[in-house]
Amino acid sequence: MKILALDSSGLVASVAVVEVDTLLGEYTINYMKTHSQTLLPMLDEVAKMIELDLNTVDVIAVSAGPGSFTGLRIGSATAKGLALALHKKIVSVPTVDALAYNLWNSPSLVCPLMDARRQQTYTGLYKFTDGTMDTVLPQCVVGIQEIIEKINEMGEAVTFLGDGVPVFREYIEENLKVPFSFAPAHCNKQRGASVAVLGAILYAQGKAEDAADHKPEYLRMSQAERERKEKERDFRI
């Protein structure tokens, strides 16, 4: 099976193609350009380099959230457009799960941290047992203090990764009471390859969907939505 994977959920944009257990190509960039400028050119470049006929792709996997609202919309719109044009299914891969999968078979707890602003983080907790990733805490949006308290209660060593690490590193170092480490550069941000491999697992579980049914998983309202609700509430008062 051949999977095309897209991830534009955070600062990183990544495109990958995986066939069975082989990574045919991956293009990842973390630079000062919007994903609307980079994602399709990256896909085009990968397709050229590996001589990919998009019609041979079996399914499209996309990092479906949480994350940057704009980034998620770009990734989902790109995946939907491709799926509709190619008559393929989409597999929605939870962003935090895919991040955790970067550290496959880690002996410690894995805790992805994505900066959700306002001292909050998109996060979760994961363990690997005999090559299988088990979810200890499903992806969620919480205050950084809440996830650190949870880890302290569990009393297990943990490895952190994600764009939230630089934001919360000082807090972690001051408040965490268990052994901890930070993932190195080659595996500490979103990767299309992880989205593809986890997407293959979800596809085998029958979790593919029609393009028309796909939508991002934001986990919370946008700033504009919150402000609108506040105005509506004030108006009712």
Describe each model-derived feature in a short phrase.
Residues M1-A64:
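N-terminal beta-alpha supersecondary unit
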Residues T22, K89-K189, Y218, Q223, ...:
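Surface "functional belts" at beta-alpha junctions
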Residues K48-N55, L84-V93, K207-A208:
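Phosphate-handling active-site elements
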Residues V62-I90, T95:
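DPxDG-like acidic metal-binding loop motif
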Residues S181-I237:
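Acyltransferase
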